[in-house]
């Protein structure tokens, strides 16, 4: 990044912070703080091992220093400003989840547009929240748009604060369905002297597979026999014979199938359940970044600060507002709206931000400031002289 661009961005970040306050987390005085300044050259330097006391007045610190990126620790410490991790005195840590579009299946960073990435990531976020709220019954959650290509979720329930890395890895494995065994989704029940094996329908992965089984059975009933048979044979391990057995079980004992009885149709239904379980775990998982969640000392972006790689706001989102949240509109800083600037670029592309489509071509362009800041922060443009 050249000097003119760097100084311009630092100055405008400072203007933003003079009118906006970062959103401090609970127990802010127990957290470690870090930031990346606007240093010359291509590299970056993280300044960390700071306490809230070291920063002084937070609003003044941000207005004066205008950091490129700002972070706080998921952990709480006895002495957060100590210069080594061993001296800090770890107390507890939030359970943090990171979703990044780069890690989503089907997303190619070189081919998928930024709006498409964010849309895919939001769907993954909704799946993650289903796990956290429905399966784990967490209720102290904070959802944050990262300002880049994804979302963070901070869980602060008392029950998670003292979990070690291995326990947190178990949560990751559950959400990502790692080593999930179909047999673990089935329980044995006794009724009037007989036993049967049924899917666990009270929640979790068993309930998801059970729901998929009911939907699949309903779809088959709406087809003629030949189409239903062909649909079943698309699944691994189901040939014509097993397909006939499954359809017969659906016809003879639909109630048992709807109850999740995996023995209602013998090996055919059991094979169907296994195939549906594989399909459900492939589509319903949330591809969270495992190292972020398992790290009990992780630094994570501070809400209401600016992301130095996009110029967008790291935005906390009320749970009730999540469906309507549009990061391309709602994370654009008001400070960068309403004026135009001149930039130089070598790219030919369209930027979709703040409800506008801004086209830039190689050479000098006059663009809305929010679009110019976005391109400069990403390294795709340089600040041009205004005259």
Curated annotation (Swiss-Prot):
Enzyme class at the top of the EC tree: transferase
GO MF annotation list: DNA-directed RNA polymerase activity; metal ion binding
Pfam families (alphabetical): DNA_primase_S (PF01896)
EC number(s) recorded for this UniProt protein: 2.7.7.-
UniProt cross-references to Gene3D superfamilies, sorted A to Z: DNA primase, PRIM domain (3.90.920.10)
Keywords for the protein's UniProt record, in alphabetical order: DNA replication, DNA-directed RNA polymerase, Magnesium, Manganese, Metal-binding, Nucleotidyltransferase, Primosome, Transcription, Transferase
Residue numbers annotated as active site: 98, 100, 289
Taxonomic superkingdom: Archaea
One of the GO BP terms on file: DNA replication, synthesis of primer
GO CC, one annotated term: DNA-directed RNA polymerase complex
Cofactor: Mg(2+); Mn(2+)
Family: Belongs to the eukaryotic-type primase small subunit family.
Subunit relationships: Heterodimer of a small subunit (PriS) and a large subunit (PriL).
Described function: Catalytic subunit of DNA primase, an RNA polymerase that catalyzes the synthesis of short RNA molecules used as primers for DNA polymerase during DNA replication. The small subunit contains the primase catalytic core and has DNA synthesis activity on its own. Binding to the large subunit stabilizes and modulates the activity, increasing the rate of DNA synthesis while decreasing the length of the DNA fragments, and conferring RNA synthesis capability. The DNA polymerase activity may enable DNA primase to also catalyze primer extension after primer synthesis. May also play a role in DNA repair.
Protein name: DNA primase small subunit PriS
UniProt lineage: Archaea, Methanobacteriati, Methanobacteriota, Stenosarchaea group, Halobacteria
């Amino acid at each position: 990044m050249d000097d003119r661009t760097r100084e311009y961005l630092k100055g405008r970040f400072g203007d933003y912070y003079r009118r906006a306050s970062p959103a401090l987390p609970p127990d802010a005085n127990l957290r470690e703080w870090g930031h990346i300044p606007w240093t010359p050259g291509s590299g970056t330097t993280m300044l960390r091992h700071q306490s809230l006391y070291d920063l002084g007045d937070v609003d003044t610190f941000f207005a004066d220093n205008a950091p490129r990126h700002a972070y706080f620790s998921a952990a709480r410490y006895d002495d957060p400003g100590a210069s080594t991790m061993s001296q800090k005195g770890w107390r507890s840590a939030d359970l943090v989840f990171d979703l990044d579009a780069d890690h989503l299946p089907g997303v190619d960073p070189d081919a998928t547009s930024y709006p498409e990435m964010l849309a895919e990531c939001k769907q993954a976020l909704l799946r993650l929240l289903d796990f956290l709220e429905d399966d784990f019954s967490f209720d102290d959650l904070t959802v944050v748009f990262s300002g880049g290509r994804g979302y963070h979720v901070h869980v602060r329930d008392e029950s998670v604060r003292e979990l070690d890395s291995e326990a947190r890895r178990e949560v990751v494995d559950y959400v990502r369905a790692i080593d999930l065994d179909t047999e673990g989704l089935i329980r044995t029940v006794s009724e009037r002297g007989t036993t049967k094996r049924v899917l666990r329908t009270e929640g979790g992965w068993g309930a998801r597979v059970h729901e998929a089984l009911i939907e699949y059975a309903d779809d088959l009933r709406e087809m003629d026999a030949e189409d239903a048979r062909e649909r079943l044979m698309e699944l691994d391990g189901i040939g014509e014979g097993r397909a006939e057995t499954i359809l017969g079980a659906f016809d003879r004992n639909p109630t048992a199938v709807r109850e999740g009885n995996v023995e209602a149709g013998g090996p055919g239904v059991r094979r169907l359940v296994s195939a549906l379980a594989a399909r459900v775990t492939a589509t319903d998982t949330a591809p969270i970044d495992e190292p972020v969640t398992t790290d009990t000392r992780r630094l994570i972006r501070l809400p209401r600060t600016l992301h130095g790689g996009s110029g967008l706001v790291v935005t906390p989102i009320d749970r009730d507002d999540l469906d309507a949240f549009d990061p391309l509109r709602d994370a654009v800083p008001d400070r960068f709206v309403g004026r135009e600037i001149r930039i130089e670029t070598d790219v030919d592309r369209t930027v979709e931000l703040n409800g506008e489509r801004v086209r830039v071509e190689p050479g000098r362009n006059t663009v809305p400031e929010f679009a110019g800041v976005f391109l400069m922060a990403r390294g795709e443009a340089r600040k041009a002289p205004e005259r």
